[in-house]
């Protein structure tokens, strides 16, 4: 079934949600094969396909080598190439590289964390991999400087897992890939971004909600604990255990 799944994924013309296809130059909702965008869905889809390929491509080859070839081509077409294409920076606005000072949100860490995982698992060209990592660091630096010093998520506590939580995912991926040489877990703003999830909690499963975020805590306890452990926040690890109780 894994082979069936990645084969199906490789045949799809796009992994982008139709609601986001309007950013194509064609301004149409159907995917234009001449242009590939990256959004929340395609990045996530690409990372899942890349993980499946990484662990099972030898098994796929036993069935038919065409499965692995098609998977490699699909990830390159849908994720790797458009990420490195300077002409796509306006469409991939979440990079923050098309126009400096532009508003950023949780798309930036979410997409970057998924895309960089695709590169680490699928890109065989070291020069392209280096470019991708450097670009992702530049993009994430813009996002981190966009966040206020108190570390609050401006989209509300319910978005924490898809904002600060994705920052943690991104940093953990690069930490693991570099054997710990790349680490921002000692940064105070990174810690405060994590602790926002516990400091916005008011009891009985409720948070101080605002923007379009819901009033109920919906962030996974394991993510809170892992984040807290990485940044050395007893507040977060204790809160994660409290949420499990």
What are these regions (language model features)?
Residues 2-5, 21-23:
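"Short basic amphipathic alpha-helical interaction patches in structured regions
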Residues 29-156:
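Active-site lining segments of carbohydrate-active enzymes
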Residues 15, 88-89, 152, 180, ...:
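Intrinsically disordered or highly flexible coil/loop and linker segments, enriched in small
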Residues 95, 162-245:
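Carbohydrate-active enzyme catalytic cores, enriched for enzymes
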Residues 1, 7-16, 30-33, 44-65, ...:
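Well-ordered alpha-helical scaffold segments within catalytic/enzyme domains
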Residues 12-24, 38:
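Short, flexible active-site-proximal loops enriched in glycine and acidic residues
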Residues 8-13, 76-77, 137-149, 188-205:
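Short, mixed-charge aromatic SLiMs
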Residues 2, 129, 133-136, 160, ...:
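Hydrophobic packing residues in well-ordered alpha-helices of helical domains and bundles
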């Amino acid at each position: 079934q894994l082979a069936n799944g990645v084969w199906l994924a490789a045949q799809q013309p796009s992994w982008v949600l139709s609601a986001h296809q309007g950013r194509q130059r064609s301004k149409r909702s159907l995917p234009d094969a001449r242009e590939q965008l990256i959004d929340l869905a395609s990045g996530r889809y690409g990372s899942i396909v890349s993980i499946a390929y990484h662990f099972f491509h030898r098994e796929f080859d036993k069935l038919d080598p065409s499965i692995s070839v098609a998977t490699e081509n699909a990830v390159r077409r849908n994720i790797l190439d458009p990420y490195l294409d300077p002409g796509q920076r306006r469409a991939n606005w979440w990079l923050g590289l098309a126009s400096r000072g532009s508003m950023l949100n949780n798309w930036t860490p979410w997409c970057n964390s998924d895309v960089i995982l695709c590169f680490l698992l699928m890109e065989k060209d070291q020069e392209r991999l280096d470019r991708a990592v450097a670009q992702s660091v530049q993009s994430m630096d813009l996002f981190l400087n966009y966040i206020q010093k108190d570390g609050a998520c401006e989209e509300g506590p319910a978005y924490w897992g898809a904002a600060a939580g994705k920052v943690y995912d991104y940093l953990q991926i690069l930490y693991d890939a570099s054997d710990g040489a790349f680490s921002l877990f000692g940064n105070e703003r990174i810690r405060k971004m994590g602790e926002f999830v516990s400091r916005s909690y008011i009891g009985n499963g409720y948070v101080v909600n605002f923007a379009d975020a819901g009033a109920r805590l919906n962030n996974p306890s394991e993510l809170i604990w892992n984040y807290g452990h990485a940044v050395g926040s007893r507040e977060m690890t204790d809160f994660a255990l409290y949420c499990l109780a």
